[in-house]
Regions:
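P-loop NTP-binding catalytic core
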Residues: 48, 61-164
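Conserved lysine of the Walker
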Residues: 178
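Hydrophobic anchor at the beta1->P-loop junction of P-loop NTPases
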Residues: 170
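Active-site phosphate-binding and catalytic loops of NTP-dependent enzymes
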Residues: 16-21, 37-48, 90-107, 193, ...
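NTP-binding/hydrolysis catalytic cores, primarily Walker-type P-loop NTPases
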Residues: 320-389
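P-loop NTPase switch/communication element
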Residues: 135-146, 163, 183, 187-234, ...
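Conserved P-loop NTPase nucleotide-binding/switch module
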Residues: 199-212, 236-335
Length: 389
């Protein structure tokens, strides 16, 4: 195909007697191929491993995120119709439709990158394409520790938590690195376990051999055929999973996830949008109420306290670095309040305000609530040793 386009371009250049360098001719061919089979002018950004997000705001603005910071690129589309054409091709590749009657869609590229599209008139200044790139290199907690995302002691505690089959919720804001942390944490799951993953858009990269990946499906234009996360969680319980991993809990499926965690599916994991561990608990309460508004609040809190063992708070800080700022245990109930305790927290140095955030990951040195569980797995000594400052 490329050879044919190169020859056609050479013929046009010769016929029109144009002065074009070899580099310019190669660029023209690349642009044609990207328009025909790729994502137009932003195709080179998909190959750039430093880029984590690509944000198209109409034909004249293409931003990227590199090293946690947004940058405006010189890339442009020809016009708004060009942006829409690329967006529709992305949606069509996964069997979805985006047009004026259905102006918003979530999709993914062939490499797994997550895509959100919004078309006019909803997008007032031109079609919007937001791409969260799929990491090509599998990141581990050890590597995250080397990058300063968390400490080595935290890695050891999380390794023990996974071995002890703790149910873990990863909490953070948009773009904070929740899915990356979930992927890294999943490396500690035993290779002999059967894992069922549930996602709106497939992003998880589990390395174990026995993984069943399920993905939701939106309703068709007649409002039929939709498969929700709640449907998939309920079905997963019939699939004999050792662990259930839900890419993100965002609605009434929270009720079913807690039920699963409380009925023998220990070691399950999910993520949630929240700014603190306490906020994560409050959000879980609200989402359970979406499923069953008749449950008393204290009953919901008891379910959370018995189902969720640990909350990891991750944050993209002002220097662009994503850090696990809290490792928080749920230690039970006192009255009608869920009790938590921090095992680790990131303490930043407020006296040294610079572009780079300075601070350290500190252990609270508290005895973990899951120490007895760790003893059952023969890991209590290692756990207490990892928590020593």
């Amino acid at each position: 195909m490329r050879e044919g386009i190169e020859q056609a371009a050479a013929d046009v250049i010769a016929r029109e007697r144009l002065t074009v360098t070899l580099a310019e001719q190669t660029l023209i061919v690349d642009e044609i191929l990207n328009d025909m089979f790729g994502v137009g002018p932003i195709e080179p950004l998909l190959a750039d491993e430093r880029v984590t997000d690509i944000l198209v705001n109409g034909p004249d603005q293409v931003y990227v995120e590199r090293a946690g910071k947004l940058e405006l690129t010189p890339l442009k589309f020809r016009d708004n119709a060009h942006v829409i054409n690329v967006a529709q091709r992305i949606a069509a590749a996964v069997g979805r439709r985006v047009d004026e009657s259905s102006p918003m869609v979530d999709a993914r590229l062939a490499d797994g990158s997550r895509v959100n599209v919004v078309l006019p008139p909803i997008a007032i200044r031109g079609a919007s394409i937001s791409i969260r790139k799929f990491a090509k290199r599998n990141i581990t907690l050890a590597r995250m520790a080397q990058q300063g995302n968390l400490s080595q002691a935290m890695v050891e505690v999380l390794k023990i938590a996974s071995a002890c089959r703790l149910n873990i919720v990863i909490s953070g804001g948009t773009g904070s690195g929740k899915t990356t942390l979930l992927n890294a944490l999943s490396h500690f799951i035993d290779s002999h376990e059967r894992i069922v993953t549930i996602e709106d858009a497939a992003e998880l990269q589990l390395q174990q051999p026995h993984v069943v990946s399920l993905e939701t499906r939106p309703e068709n234009s007649e409002g039929l055929g939709g498969v929700s996360q709640r449907d998939l969680v309920r079905n997963a319980l019939r699939m004999r999973p050792d662990r259930i991993i839900l890419g993100e809990t965002r609605g009434p499926e929270a009720f079913d996830v807690l039920q699963a965690m409380n009925t023998g599916h220990d070691g399950s994991m999910t993520t949630i949008h929240a700014n603190t561990p306490r906020d994560a608990i409050t959000r879980l309460e609200s989402m359970v109420m979406m499923a069953n508004g008749n449950l008393p609040l204290v009953s919901i809190r008891r379910q959370i306290a018995s189902a969720v063992h640990m909350i990891l708070q991750i944050e993209r800080m002002r220097d662009g670095v994503r850090r696990v700022t809290r490792v928080t245990e749920i230690a039970g109930m006192e009255g009608d309040v869920v009790i938590t305790q921090d095992l680790f927290a990131f303490r930043y140095d407020a006296s040294a305000f610079q572009e780079q955030v300075h601070g350290m990951f500190e252990s609270s040195s508290l005895r973990p609530a899951f120490a007895q569980r760790a003893a059952y797995y023969g890991l209590e000594g290692a756990l207490l040793g990892a928590l020593q400052p």
